[in-house]
Regions:
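N-terminal glycine-rich FAD/FM-binding segment characteristic of electron-transfer flavoproteins
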Residues: 1-297
């Protein structure tokens, strides 16, 4: 079977290629400048144009899908990727399944797995869908020895989008998805000033500071880029320390890939203790200073 892979993010395209290349012949389509010729694709097509938006990119991909006779489309699950997937589903009259983390072939169907019920469980589905968006961070991109052919394709068709103004979003200072150690704060810290002790612990163990949805979006104690959860970042560090986090399913969905989870919470019945490898029941303002003291020795 042959697959069309698309992502505007080079790393995400490389991740999907790493997942699919052993079982399928793949071509990569991207608007990224990242070198992608070492990830097992037959051809890497770089899409260029003066005004590239989801509408003309989708129209182009739909035409190529029919022209090349691909069997299915694998798209990186980004804001743009999900929008393009929905447009392609309409243009090609094909079913789409989003946010998947596993894809297999069945008897004239595809079998997919994705998080369900806020990440608390995994749903395994059989369907005739032919468009899939893949969650980011499922694998680390692994290059191969062979090299792909490369082609550049310019889209000349104008977009129907009329850009009135562009406001650049400030670039973040942290990339939680890449962090090996994360110390996350929940509403249980009680006050913004409590982040000071969280930062101290993170600094000593060379980690990054993250936060739950309430801390980042409701109270604005931390920036949005530091939110871990279903609607925030999905992380998989070597060590994840949850401080004052109750462990609601929305948060667990974002840190489920962590190798070792340590929880600190004064509520012994907090759901986070069902998800952690090591748990400490106690007041964080007593526990963390003792941890810092011992780590300094």
């Amino acid at each position: 079977m042959r697959a069309m892979v698309f992502s505007e993010k080079g790393e995400l395209a490389a991740q999907i290629a790493t997942i699919l290349r052993e079982r399928y012949e793949i071509d990569i389509y991207t608007t990224s400048d990242s070198p992608l010729d070492s990830y097992g694709a037959k051809v890497v097509f770089r899409i260029t144009g003066e005004s590239l938006y989801v509408d003309n990119i989708s129209n182009f991909l739909a035409d190529r899908f029919k022209e090349k006779g691909y069997d299915f489309i694998a798209i990186g699950s980004s804001v743009m990727g999900r929008e393009i997937a929905s447009i392609l589903s309409e243009l090609l009259h094909l079913e789409a399944i989003t946010e998947i983390m596993k894809l297999e072939e069945g008897n004239q169907v595809f079998i997919t797995e994705r998080f369900f019920f806020g990440g608390k469980t995994v749903i395994r589905e059989e369907s005739k869908a032919r468009i899939f968006t893949f969650l980011p961070g499922l694998v680390d991109p692994m290059p191969v020895d062979s090299r792909s052919s490369k082609e550049e394709i310019k889209i000349d068709s104008p977009s129907t989008v009329n850009v009135v103004e562009k406001i650049e979003k400030p670039k973040g200072s942290v990339n939680l998805e890449k962090a090996d150690i994360i110390v996350s704060a929940g509403r249980g810290i009680g006050k913004k000033e409590g982040l000071g002790i969280i930062q101290q612990l993170a600094d000593i163990i060379h980690g990054e500071v993250g936060g739950s949805r309430p801390v980042c979006l409701d109270y604005h104690w931390l920036s949005e880029e530091r939110q871990v959860g279903l609607s925030g970042k999905r992380v998989k560090p070597k060590i994840y320390i949850a401080v004052g986090i109750s462990g609601q399913v929305q948060h667990i969905a974002g840190m489920r890939g962590s190798k070792t989870v340590i929880a600190i919470n004064k509520d012994k019945n907090a759901p986070i203790f069902n998800e952690c490898d090591y748990g400490i029941v106690g007041d964080l303002y007593t526990v963390i200073p003792k941890l810092i003291e011992n780590l300094k020795k």
